[in-house]
Amino acid sequence: MSDIKDTVKRLMAMRDLDEIFALEDDTDFATALSSALCDWTNYGEHLDLLSPEAQVFYLCDQLDNEINSDGFVSFIFERYGQWAPETVDALETIGAPQTADILRRAIAMLPDGVCPRDYTQRNDLLFEDEDKYYTAYNALDEEFYAYPDGTLTDLYVTYARDHRDCFSAPEK
């Protein structure tokens, strides 16, 4: 167990992109690149510091992590919901149109079909009708878990590797 912890710690501490992109194992690569991008953007707070291609990886990775952790309720109503429309575009970009459609339907369930950028506004919506959102989003979670476009991680890792020259550490 200690070896696994040490490996994860090592991957999450990597910041050299040449070293990260040299990783052969896709899971190791995704872990290391995700950690670096989270660090460089303060968990998305400064997403604009990343290239459009790095943003695509970041948004798809965060969606994948959130849905597999706590489902669409977590993604929409927590931090990353503010980028829900951009995440739809990112999914299309990596070749995941069916997953993009699932997210589009999650957004469409919100009033006026709009996911507010503001965290408090999103949470107010959730607390107004918690049962409705949990029930509806649980059904979408199941669709997501079927990976209709294939494993999402494979798609965004392939995309990142294909666009290596577009990834760089932001200027300090």
Residue map of PLM features:
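Extended, alpha-helix-rich binding/interface surfaces that flank or overlap catalytic cores
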Residues: S2-Y58, D64-S69, V73-F77, G81-A84, ...
